[in-house]
């Protein structure tokens, strides 16, 4: 019996997945930092929060909002992707900044822990902790 029962029709899609090695990850990390423009944008308020995940570890969460907001607004939790192995890239931060400024919502941007250093389900639990934190702080996020 195989480890996972995967339908054979999906096997060709495996050819589109690039190999990710520890060397590739190590080379990419220096380029995956929050851009300085995040704190220099005159139209944006950015606050940093340390939130507690399921195992007691603290993760960083940025909250971005337009300085033009004056009424209650929705909140978007932005999970950057990266297959849960790559940190957020500059364009992820750019997307979140645009949501905050152009859509007029608060953006919660968690820096969840990544594989392979933190195995499943750590990254999912960190994302859920960010959701719970946003829910618990809904009044101040409005």
Segment roles from a protein language model:
Residues 88-89, 95-96, 109-142:
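Catalytic nucleophile-loop/oxyanion-hole region of alpha/beta-hydrolase
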Residues 72-83:
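Short beta-strand element of the alpha/beta-hydrolase
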Residues 47-49, 77, 108:
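Hydrophobic/aromatic beta-strand patches that form the interior of the parallel beta-sheet core
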Residues 75, 104-108, 113:
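A fold-wide structural signal in alpha/beta-hydrolase
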Residues 1-66:
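A glycine/proline-hinged amphipathic helix-loop "lid/cap" segment
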Residues 65, 93-98:
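Short, charged beta->alpha transition segments
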Residues 80, 86-87, 91:
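Conserved AMP-binding/adenylate-forming
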């Amino acid at each position: 019996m195989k480890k996972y029962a995967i339908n054979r029709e999906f096997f060709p899609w495996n050819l589109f997945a690039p190999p990710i090695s520890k060397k590739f990850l190590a080379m990419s990390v220096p380029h995956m930092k929050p851009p300085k423009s995040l704190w220099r944008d005159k139209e944006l308020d950015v606050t940093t929060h340390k939130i507690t995940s399921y195992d007691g570890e603290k993760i960083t969460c940025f909250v971005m909002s337009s300085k033009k907001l004056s009424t209650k607004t929705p909140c978007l939790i932005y999970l950057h992707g990266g297959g849960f192995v790559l940190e957020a890239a500059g364009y992820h931060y750019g997307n979140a900044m645009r949501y905050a400024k152009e859509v007029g919502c608060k953006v919660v941007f968690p820096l969840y822990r990544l594989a392979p250093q933190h195995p499943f389900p750590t990254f999912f639990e960190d994302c859920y902790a960010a959701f719970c934190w946003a829910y618990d702080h809904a009044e101040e996020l409005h």
